[in-house]
Swiss-Prot record:
Residues 18-320 are extracellular. A SLe(x)-type proteoglycan, which through high affinity, calcium-dependent interactions with E-, P- and L-selectins, mediates rapid rolling of leukocytes over vascular surfaces during the initial steps in inflammation. Critical for the initial leukocyte capture. (Microbial infection) Acts as a receptor for enterovirus 71. Changing Y48F: Binding L-selectin reduced by 20%, neutrophil recruitment reduced by 30%, and lymphocyte rolling reduced by 32%. Binding L-lectin reduced by 31%, neutrophil recruitment reduced by 52%, and lymphocyte rolling reduced by 52%. Homodimer; disulfide-linked. Interaction with P-, E- and L-selectins, through their lectin/EGF domains, is required for promoting recruitment and rolling of leukocytes. These interactions require sialyl Lewis X glycan modification but there is a differing dependence for tyrosine sulfations. Sulfation on Tyr-51 of PSGL1 is most important for high affinity L-selectin/SELL binding while P-selectin/SELP requires sulfation on Tyr-48. E-selectin/SELE binds with much lower affinity and requires the sLe(x) epitope, but apparently not tyrosine sulfation. (Microbial infection) Interacts with enterovirus 71 capsid proteins. GO terms for biological process: cell adhesion; cellular response to interleukin-6; leukocyte adhesive activation; leukocyte migration; leukocyte tethering or rolling. This is P-selectin glycoprotein ligand 1. Residues 342-412 are cytoplasmic. The keyword Cell cycle does not apply. The chain crosses the membrane at residues 321-341. Sequence repeats lie at residues 122-131, 132-141, 142-151, 162-171, 182-191, 192-201, 202-211, 212-221, 222-231, 232-241, 242-251, 252-261.
Length: 412
Protein backbone atom coordinates (compact mmCIF):
# COMPACT_ATOMS: atom_id res chain seq x y z
CA UNK A 1 0.00 0.00 0.00
CA UNK A 2 2.80 2.56 0.74
CA UNK A 3 4.34 1.63 -2.60
CA UNK A 4 1.14 2.53 -4.39
CA UNK A 5 0.82 5.82 -2.50
CA UNK A 6 4.40 6.78 -3.33
CA UNK A 7 3.87 5.94 -6.99
CA UNK A 8 0.67 7.99 -7.00
CA UNK A 9 2.49 11.01 -5.54
CA UNK A 10 5.21 10.70 -8.18
CA UNK A 11 2.72 10.49 -11.01
CA UNK A 12 0.56 13.35 -9.72
CA UNK A 13 3.51 15.69 -9.18
CA UNK A 14 3.83 19.13 -10.87
CA UNK A 15 3.81 18.96 -14.65
CA UNK A 16 1.98 15.64 -14.87
CA UNK A 17 -1.71 15.52 -15.63
CA UNK A 18 -2.12 11.76 -15.65
CA UNK A 19 -5.38 10.23 -14.48
CA UNK A 20 -5.58 8.20 -11.28
CA UNK A 21 -7.22 5.20 -12.83
CA UNK A 22 -4.75 5.15 -15.71
CA UNK A 23 -1.80 4.38 -13.46
CA UNK A 24 -3.25 2.70 -10.37
CA UNK A 25 -3.60 -0.76 -11.92
CA UNK A 26 -0.76 -0.68 -14.44
CA UNK A 27 2.06 1.16 -12.69
CA UNK A 28 1.55 -0.58 -9.35
CA UNK A 29 3.00 -3.78 -10.74
CA UNK A 30 6.22 -2.19 -11.92
CA UNK A 31 9.31 -2.07 -9.76
CA UNK A 32 9.72 1.41 -8.26
CA UNK A 33 13.47 1.05 -7.72
CA UNK A 34 14.63 0.98 -11.37
CA UNK A 35 12.25 3.81 -12.23
CA UNK A 36 13.65 6.10 -9.54
CA UNK A 37 17.25 5.04 -10.17
CA UNK A 38 17.14 5.82 -13.87
CA UNK A 39 14.86 8.83 -13.46
CA UNK A 40 12.58 7.57 -16.20
CA UNK A 41 9.61 9.34 -17.62
CA UNK A 42 6.43 8.09 -15.99
CA UNK A 43 3.77 7.15 -18.49
CA UNK A 44 0.55 5.21 -18.34
CA UNK A 45 0.41 1.75 -19.80
CA UNK A 46 -2.85 1.33 -21.51
CA UNK A 47 -3.08 -1.99 -23.23
CA UNK A 48 -2.54 -0.45 -26.64
CA UNK A 49 -2.67 -3.75 -28.45
CA UNK A 50 -1.50 -3.58 -32.02
CA UNK A 51 -3.15 -5.65 -34.73
CA UNK A 52 0.05 -7.02 -36.18
CA UNK A 53 2.77 -6.57 -33.61
CA UNK A 54 2.98 -7.90 -30.07
CA UNK A 55 6.22 -6.82 -28.38
CA UNK A 56 7.78 -9.60 -26.36
CA UNK A 57 11.18 -8.13 -25.50
CA UNK A 58 12.45 -6.05 -22.63
CA UNK A 59 11.20 -2.43 -22.50
CA UNK A 60 13.71 0.21 -23.66
CA UNK A 61 15.00 3.21 -21.82
CA UNK A 62 12.20 5.54 -20.85
CA UNK A 63 12.34 9.31 -21.15
CA UNK A 64 13.06 11.76 -18.41
CA UNK A 65 10.52 13.51 -16.21
CA UNK A 66 11.19 17.23 -15.93
CA UNK A 67 8.74 18.55 -13.35
CA UNK A 68 9.85 22.17 -13.59
CA UNK A 69 8.46 22.76 -17.08
CA UNK A 70 5.03 23.67 -18.26
CA UNK A 71 2.82 21.14 -20.09
CA UNK A 72 2.94 23.12 -23.32
CA UNK A 73 6.56 24.00 -23.99
CA UNK A 74 9.95 22.71 -22.95
CA UNK A 75 12.84 24.84 -21.74
CA UNK A 76 14.51 24.91 -25.15
CA UNK A 77 11.64 25.27 -27.53
CA UNK A 78 12.33 27.71 -30.38
CA UNK A 79 8.94 29.32 -30.47
CA UNK A 80 6.18 28.62 -27.99
CA UNK A 81 3.46 30.56 -29.76
CA UNK A 82 3.20 28.15 -32.67
CA UNK A 83 2.03 25.22 -30.63
CA UNK A 84 -1.22 23.66 -31.68
CA UNK A 85 -3.91 23.15 -29.00
CA UNK A 86 -2.25 21.25 -26.23
CA UNK A 87 -5.19 19.12 -25.29
CA UNK A 88 -6.04 17.93 -28.73
CA UNK A 89 -7.20 14.41 -28.16
CA UNK A 90 -7.69 11.69 -30.65
CA UNK A 91 -9.53 8.47 -30.18
CA UNK A 92 -8.77 5.19 -31.90
CA UNK A 93 -9.66 1.53 -31.57
CA UNK A 94 -7.15 -0.86 -30.11
CA UNK A 95 -6.97 -4.59 -30.95
CA UNK A 96 -9.41 -5.53 -28.19
CA UNK A 97 -11.99 -3.08 -29.46
CA UNK A 98 -11.53 -0.71 -26.52
CA UNK A 99 -11.43 2.99 -27.24
CA UNK A 100 -8.07 4.44 -26.31
CA UNK A 101 -7.34 8.11 -25.97
CA UNK A 102 -4.13 9.43 -27.40
CA UNK A 103 -3.11 12.98 -26.72
CA UNK A 104 -0.48 14.89 -28.63
CA UNK A 105 0.13 17.08 -25.61
CA UNK A 106 2.19 16.19 -22.59
CA UNK A 107 -0.93 15.30 -20.59
CA UNK A 108 -0.35 11.56 -20.82
CA UNK A 109 3.34 11.73 -21.52
CA UNK A 110 4.58 13.80 -18.63
CA UNK A 111 6.56 16.98 -19.09
CA UNK A 112 9.41 16.50 -21.52
CA UNK A 113 12.50 18.65 -21.58
CA UNK A 114 13.08 19.42 -25.23
CA UNK A 115 16.27 21.45 -25.49
CA UNK A 116 17.47 21.84 -29.06
CA UNK A 117 20.81 20.30 -28.11
CA UNK A 118 19.51 17.41 -25.98
CA UNK A 119 16.36 15.79 -27.24
CA UNK A 120 14.79 12.63 -26.00
CA UNK A 121 15.60 9.31 -27.66
CA UNK A 122 12.97 6.82 -28.51
CA UNK A 123 13.90 3.35 -29.67
CA UNK A 124 11.49 0.93 -31.19
CA UNK A 125 11.46 -2.84 -30.79
CA UNK A 126 11.84 -5.01 -33.92
CA UNK A 127 8.11 -5.63 -34.02
CA UNK A 128 7.07 -2.16 -32.94
CA UNK A 129 5.56 0.28 -35.37
CA UNK A 130 7.38 3.38 -36.50
CA UNK A 131 8.16 5.57 -33.52
CA UNK A 132 7.64 9.20 -34.30
CA UNK A 133 8.77 11.22 -31.31
CA UNK A 134 6.97 14.47 -30.81
CA UNK A 135 8.17 17.72 -29.35
CA UNK A 136 5.76 19.71 -27.22
CA UNK A 137 5.85 22.58 -29.70
CA UNK A 138 5.12 21.06 -33.12
CA UNK A 139 2.42 18.54 -33.72
CA UNK A 140 1.99 16.35 -36.75
CA UNK A 141 -1.21 16.33 -38.76
CA UNK A 142 -0.74 14.58 -42.06
CA UNK A 143 -3.46 15.58 -44.47
CA UNK A 144 -3.17 13.95 -47.88
CA UNK A 145 -5.45 16.20 -50.03
CA UNK A 146 -3.65 18.68 -52.29
CA UNK A 147 -4.27 21.70 -50.10
CA UNK A 148 -3.57 19.97 -46.81
CA UNK A 149 -0.47 20.41 -44.66
CA UNK A 150 1.28 17.86 -42.53
CA UNK A 151 2.52 19.10 -39.21
CA UNK A 152 5.21 16.82 -37.88
CA UNK A 153 6.50 17.30 -34.39
CA UNK A 154 9.41 15.00 -33.86
CA UNK A 155 12.26 14.83 -31.44
CA UNK A 156 15.68 15.07 -32.90
CA UNK A 157 17.69 12.21 -31.46
CA UNK A 158 15.09 9.45 -31.94
CA UNK A 159 15.05 6.87 -34.72
CA UNK A 160 13.47 9.62 -36.78
CA UNK A 161 15.52 12.58 -35.51
CA UNK A 162 15.03 16.17 -36.53
CA UNK A 163 17.96 18.52 -36.13
CA UNK A 164 17.40 22.23 -36.65
CA UNK A 165 20.50 23.97 -38.00
CA UNK A 166 20.06 27.37 -39.62
CA UNK A 167 21.04 26.59 -43.19
CA UNK A 168 20.65 22.82 -43.42
CA UNK A 169 18.54 21.21 -46.09
CA UNK A 170 16.66 18.02 -45.47
CA UNK A 171 18.63 15.08 -46.80
CA UNK A 172 17.48 11.58 -46.15
CA UNK A 173 19.90 9.04 -47.60
CA UNK A 174 19.74 5.27 -47.75
CA UNK A 175 21.66 2.17 -48.86
CA UNK A 176 20.48 0.36 -52.02
CA UNK A 177 18.46 -2.27 -50.13
CA UNK A 178 15.90 0.25 -48.91
CA UNK A 179 12.30 -0.85 -49.22
CA UNK A 180 10.83 2.65 -49.44
CA UNK A 181 12.26 5.09 -51.99
CA UNK A 182 10.90 8.48 -52.85
CA UNK A 183 12.52 9.29 -56.19
CA UNK A 184 12.62 12.82 -57.55
CA UNK A 185 14.44 14.61 -60.39
CA UNK A 186 17.88 16.14 -59.88
CA UNK A 187 16.12 19.36 -58.84
CA UNK A 188 14.44 17.51 -55.94
CA UNK A 189 15.74 18.48 -52.53
CA UNK A 190 14.83 15.31 -50.68
CA UNK A 191 15.39 11.63 -51.28
CA UNK A 192 13.77 9.50 -48.65
CA UNK A 193 15.19 6.03 -48.29
CA UNK A 194 15.78 3.70 -45.41
CA UNK A 195 18.59 1.42 -44.21
CA UNK A 196 18.89 -2.19 -45.49
CA UNK A 197 17.02 -3.40 -42.44
CA UNK A 198 14.48 -0.60 -42.71
CA UNK A 199 10.93 -1.63 -43.41
CA UNK A 200 8.94 1.57 -43.55
CA UNK A 201 5.94 0.16 -45.38
CA UNK A 202 2.77 2.13 -45.65
CA UNK A 203 0.36 -0.71 -46.10
CA UNK A 204 -3.32 -0.05 -46.66
CA UNK A 205 -5.44 -3.09 -45.78
CA UNK A 206 -9.18 -3.40 -46.73
CA UNK A 207 -9.86 -2.01 -43.31
CA UNK A 208 -7.76 0.98 -44.38
CA UNK A 209 -5.23 0.84 -41.56
CA UNK A 210 -1.89 2.37 -42.48
CA UNK A 211 0.97 0.93 -40.46
CA UNK A 212 4.38 2.49 -40.74
CA UNK A 213 6.93 0.05 -39.37
CA UNK A 214 10.66 0.61 -38.91
CA UNK A 215 13.10 -1.81 -37.15
CA UNK A 216 15.66 -0.37 -34.76
CA UNK A 217 18.25 -0.30 -37.56
CA UNK A 218 16.25 2.30 -39.47
CA UNK A 219 17.69 5.75 -38.71
CA UNK A 220 15.97 8.54 -40.56
CA UNK A 221 17.62 11.90 -40.02
CA UNK A 222 15.52 14.90 -40.83
CA UNK A 223 17.41 18.18 -40.74
CA UNK A 224 15.20 21.23 -40.87
CA UNK A 225 15.82 24.90 -41.42
CA UNK A 226 14.30 27.26 -38.87
CA UNK A 227 13.79 30.28 -41.10
CA UNK A 228 13.21 28.87 -44.58
CA UNK A 229 10.68 26.43 -45.97
CA UNK A 230 12.09 23.50 -47.84
CA UNK A 231 9.99 22.64 -50.87
CA UNK A 232 10.32 19.33 -52.56
CA UNK A 233 9.16 19.78 -56.13
CA UNK A 234 8.97 17.20 -58.88
CA UNK A 235 9.10 17.88 -62.62
CA UNK A 236 6.01 17.18 -64.79
CA UNK A 237 7.36 13.81 -65.84
CA UNK A 238 8.72 12.85 -62.41
CA UNK A 239 6.39 11.26 -59.92
CA UNK A 240 7.13 10.24 -56.39
CA UNK A 241 6.75 6.50 -56.02
CA UNK A 242 6.90 4.84 -52.69
CA UNK A 243 7.80 1.23 -53.37
CA UNK A 244 6.71 -0.92 -50.48
CA UNK A 245 7.01 -4.62 -49.61
CA UNK A 246 4.90 -7.24 -51.45
CA UNK A 247 2.18 -6.74 -48.89
CA UNK A 248 2.16 -3.00 -49.36
CA UNK A 249 -0.66 -1.80 -51.57
CA UNK A 250 -0.55 1.96 -51.38
CA UNK A 251 1.47 3.97 -53.84
CA UNK A 252 1.77 7.68 -53.21
CA UNK A 253 2.43 9.66 -56.37
CA UNK A 254 2.50 13.36 -56.96
CA UNK A 255 0.54 14.90 -59.87
CA UNK A 256 2.16 16.96 -62.60
CA UNK A 257 1.73 20.30 -60.92
CA UNK A 258 1.75 19.03 -57.34
CA UNK A 259 4.63 19.94 -55.06
CA UNK A 260 5.41 18.27 -51.79
CA UNK A 261 6.51 20.94 -49.36
CA UNK A 262 8.19 19.74 -46.19
CA UNK A 263 8.24 22.92 -44.17
CA UNK A 264 9.71 22.66 -40.71
CA UNK A 265 9.74 26.25 -39.60
CA UNK A 266 9.46 26.98 -35.87
CA UNK A 267 5.85 25.92 -36.25
CA UNK A 268 7.16 22.68 -37.80
CA UNK A 269 4.45 22.25 -40.40
CA UNK A 270 5.28 19.77 -43.12
CA UNK A 271 3.09 20.04 -46.20
CA UNK A 272 2.76 16.81 -48.07
CA UNK A 273 0.77 17.41 -51.24
CA UNK A 274 0.03 14.13 -52.84
CA UNK A 275 -2.12 13.01 -55.71
CA UNK A 276 -5.77 12.48 -54.79
CA UNK A 277 -5.88 9.48 -57.11
CA UNK A 278 -3.95 7.17 -54.82
CA UNK A 279 -4.99 3.55 -54.57
CA UNK A 280 -8.63 3.28 -53.49
CA UNK A 281 -8.71 7.05 -53.02
CA UNK A 282 -7.54 7.04 -49.42
CA UNK A 283 -7.49 10.45 -47.79
CA UNK A 284 -5.99 9.65 -44.42
CA UNK A 285 -5.40 12.58 -42.09
CA UNK A 286 -3.68 11.36 -38.94
CA UNK A 287 -1.99 13.00 -36.02
CA UNK A 288 0.87 11.07 -34.52
CA UNK A 289 1.75 11.15 -30.87
CA UNK A 290 4.36 9.17 -28.99
CA UNK A 291 2.85 6.70 -26.59
CA UNK A 292 4.16 3.67 -24.77
CA UNK A 293 2.84 0.15 -25.13
CA UNK A 294 4.16 -2.05 -22.33
CA UNK A 295 7.16 0.24 -21.95
CA UNK A 296 7.85 0.49 -25.68
CA UNK A 297 7.49 3.92 -27.33
CA UNK A 298 5.55 3.57 -30.49
CA UNK A 299 3.68 5.76 -32.92
CA UNK A 300 -0.05 5.80 -32.40
CA UNK A 301 -2.11 7.57 -35.00
CA UNK A 302 -5.70 8.63 -35.23
CA UNK A 303 -6.74 7.40 -38.64
CA UNK A 304 -9.73 9.30 -39.91
CA UNK A 305 -10.31 7.40 -43.13
CA UNK A 306 -12.67 8.72 -45.74
CA UNK A 307 -13.69 6.35 -48.52
CA UNK A 308 -14.69 8.25 -51.63
CA UNK A 309 -16.51 6.27 -54.24
CA UNK A 310 -13.73 4.98 -56.46
CA UNK A 311 -13.47 3.05 -59.68
CA UNK A 312 -13.78 -0.45 -58.10
CA UNK A 313 -17.14 0.46 -56.60
CA UNK A 314 -18.39 1.66 -59.97
CA UNK A 315 -17.14 -1.52 -61.61
CA UNK A 316 -18.90 -3.72 -59.08
CA UNK A 317 -22.16 -1.82 -59.51
CA UNK A 318 -21.89 -2.10 -63.28
CA UNK A 319 -21.27 -5.82 -63.05
CA UNK A 320 -24.30 -6.30 -60.83
CA UNK A 321 -26.50 -4.31 -63.20
CA UNK A 322 -25.22 -6.32 -66.17
CA UNK A 323 -26.01 -9.61 -64.41
CA UNK A 324 -29.51 -8.40 -63.54
CA UNK A 325 -30.07 -7.34 -67.17
CA UNK A 326 -28.97 -10.74 -68.49
CA UNK A 327 -31.29 -12.57 -66.09
CA UNK A 328 -34.17 -10.30 -67.10
CA UNK A 329 -33.56 -11.06 -70.80
CA UNK A 330 -33.51 -14.81 -70.15
CA UNK A 331 -36.78 -14.61 -68.20
CA UNK A 332 -38.40 -12.55 -70.98
CA UNK A 333 -37.36 -15.06 -73.67
CA UNK A 334 -38.73 -17.93 -71.59
CA UNK A 335 -42.05 -16.15 -71.10
CA UNK A 336 -42.42 -15.35 -74.82
CA UNK A 337 -41.67 -18.95 -75.81
CA UNK A 338 -44.27 -20.24 -73.36
CA UNK A 339 -46.98 -17.95 -74.75
CA UNK A 340 -46.19 -18.87 -78.37
CA UNK A 341 -46.32 -22.62 -77.66
CA UNK A 342 -49.62 -22.28 -75.80
CA UNK A 343 -51.21 -20.40 -78.71
CA UNK A 344 -50.07 -22.97 -81.26
CA UNK A 345 -51.35 -25.90 -79.20
CA UNK A 346 -54.76 -24.27 -78.83
CA UNK A 347 -55.02 -23.74 -82.60
CA UNK A 348 -54.20 -27.41 -83.33
CA UNK A 349 -57.05 -28.48 -81.06
CA UNK A 350 -59.55 -26.56 -83.16
CA UNK A 351 -58.19 -27.76 -86.48
CA UNK A 352 -58.26 -31.46 -85.53
CA UNK A 353 -61.39 -32.29 -83.49
CA UNK A 354 -61.31 -35.35 -81.24
CA UNK A 355 -64.48 -37.13 -82.51
CA UNK A 356 -66.03 -36.88 -85.97
CA UNK A 357 -68.57 -39.67 -86.69
CA UNK A 358 -70.33 -40.33 -90.02
CA UNK A 359 -73.68 -42.21 -90.55
CA UNK A 360 -72.02 -44.79 -92.83
CA UNK A 361 -70.23 -46.37 -89.89
CA UNK A 362 -73.56 -47.04 -88.15
CA UNK A 363 -74.97 -48.63 -91.30
CA UNK A 364 -72.03 -51.00 -91.67
CA UNK A 365 -72.29 -52.17 -88.10
CA UNK A 366 -76.03 -52.71 -88.27
CA UNK A 367 -75.76 -54.76 -91.47
CA UNK A 368 -73.76 -57.38 -89.61
CA UNK A 369 -76.51 -58.00 -87.11
CA UNK A 370 -78.77 -61.01 -87.87
CA UNK A 371 -82.35 -60.44 -88.90
CA UNK A 372 -83.60 -62.86 -86.23
CA UNK A 373 -85.25 -61.73 -83.04
CA UNK A 374 -82.03 -61.10 -81.16
CA UNK A 375 -82.99 -57.68 -80.09
CA UNK A 376 -84.08 -54.75 -82.12
CA UNK A 377 -81.94 -54.22 -85.19
CA UNK A 378 -81.07 -50.82 -86.55
CA UNK A 379 -82.14 -49.82 -90.03
CA UNK A 380 -80.18 -47.83 -92.53
CA UNK A 381 -81.42 -44.52 -91.22
CA UNK A 382 -80.81 -45.46 -87.60
CA UNK A 383 -84.33 -46.56 -86.74
CA UNK A 384 -85.25 -49.77 -84.91
CA UNK A 385 -86.68 -52.76 -86.81
CA UNK A 386 -90.20 -53.76 -85.72
CA UNK A 387 -89.93 -57.43 -86.66
CA UNK A 388 -90.00 -59.40 -83.45
CA UNK A 389 -90.77 -63.02 -82.68
CA UNK A 390 -92.78 -63.39 -79.45
CA UNK A 391 -91.48 -66.88 -78.66
CA UNK A 392 -87.87 -65.87 -78.46
CA UNK A 393 -88.21 -62.96 -76.08
CA UNK A 394 -86.81 -64.70 -72.93
CA UNK A 395 -83.64 -65.88 -74.72
CA UNK A 396 -82.16 -62.48 -75.42
CA UNK A 397 -82.13 -61.74 -71.69
CA UNK A 398 -79.96 -64.81 -71.10
CA UNK A 399 -77.81 -64.05 -74.13
CA UNK A 400 -77.40 -60.40 -73.16
CA UNK A 401 -75.63 -61.32 -69.97
CA UNK A 402 -72.14 -60.04 -70.46
CA UNK A 403 -70.91 -59.29 -73.99
CA UNK A 404 -72.09 -62.47 -75.74
CA UNK A 405 -74.70 -60.65 -77.83
CA UNK A 406 -72.19 -58.24 -79.21
CA UNK A 407 -69.66 -60.96 -80.01
CA UNK A 408 -72.19 -63.19 -81.80
CA UNK A 409 -73.50 -60.28 -83.80
CA UNK A 410 -70.09 -59.62 -85.38
CA UNK A 411 -69.26 -63.26 -86.08
CA UNK A 412 -70.38 -64.77 -89.50
Amino acid sequence: MPLQLLLLLILLGPGNSLQLWDTWADEAEKALGPLLARDRRQATEYEYLDYDFLPETEPPEMLRNSTDTTPLTGPGTPESTTVEPAARRSTGLDAGGAVTELTTELANMGNLSTDSAAMEIQTTQPAATEAQTTQPVPTEAQTTPLAATEAQTTRLTATEAQTTPLAATEAQTTPPAATEAQTTQPTGLEAQTTAPAAMEAQTTAPAAMEAQTTPPAAMEAQTTQTTAMEAQTTAPEATEAQTTQPTATEAQTTPLAAMEALSTEPSATEALSMEPTTKRGLFIPFSVSSVTHKGIPMAASNLSVNYPVGAPDHISVKQCLLAILILALVATIFFVCTVVLAVRLSRKGHMYPVRNYSPTEMVCISSLLPDGGEGPSATANGGLSKAKSPGLTPEPREDREGDDLTLHSFLP
